[in-house]
Amino acid sequence: MPRRRLIGQRKILPDPKLGSERLAKFINILMKNGKKSLAETIVYSALEIIAKRSGKNYLEAFEAALDNVRPAIEVKSRRVGGSTYQVPVEVRSIRRDTLAMRWIVEAARKRSDKSMAIRLANELVDATEHKGAAVKKREEVHRMADANKAFAHYRW
């Protein structure tokens, strides 16, 4: 925590093609070594693949995938009297989006398809259908929170 004042969160400029701030955040998460134009190319081509396959709008498909991966609750470690408890905590809305995007990108990178655009498109399609590694990660986090429900009174 800063001593003087809280620093506000940086504003992310919307992406140039579709004007969506969430998509710009997704591109930034996908980006490696500052190569933003490459990340944009990958994301836009993945969205085109999804649009051809499903016939949906770009952003509708993207939002549907994010909705199915967003976690509602997670566990945080809390030390109480010499032992550490996994305390279930509700996830803030900004962190929900960030975690969902991060999990989708990680799952897409672990896939074994030809190009990153195809891997990302397949992971997004799987997420819209409640399948895939990103959705599995969300279910795992929810299961952990459910298993540690007894420690919810240690919330801070």
From Swiss-Prot:
Gene3D superfamilies: Ribosomal protein S7 domain. Keywords: Ribonucleoprotein, Ribosomal protein, RNA-binding, rRNA-binding, tRNA-binding. Pfam families: Ribosomal_S7. CDD domains: uS7_Bacteria. One of its GO terms (biological process) is translation. GO terms for molecular function: rRNA binding; structural constituent of ribosome; tRNA binding. One of its GO terms (cellular component) is small ribosomal subunit. The keyword Lipid metabolism does not apply. SUPFAM superfamilies: Ribosomal protein S7. It comes from the Bacteria. Belongs to the universal ribosomal protein uS7 family. Part of the 30S ribosomal subunit. Contacts proteins S9 and S11. One of the primary rRNA binding proteins, it binds directly to 16S rRNA where it nucleates assembly of the head domain of the 30S subunit. Is located at the subunit interface close to the decoding center, probably blocks exit of the E-site tRNA. This is Small ribosomal subunit protein uS7. The gene is rpsG.
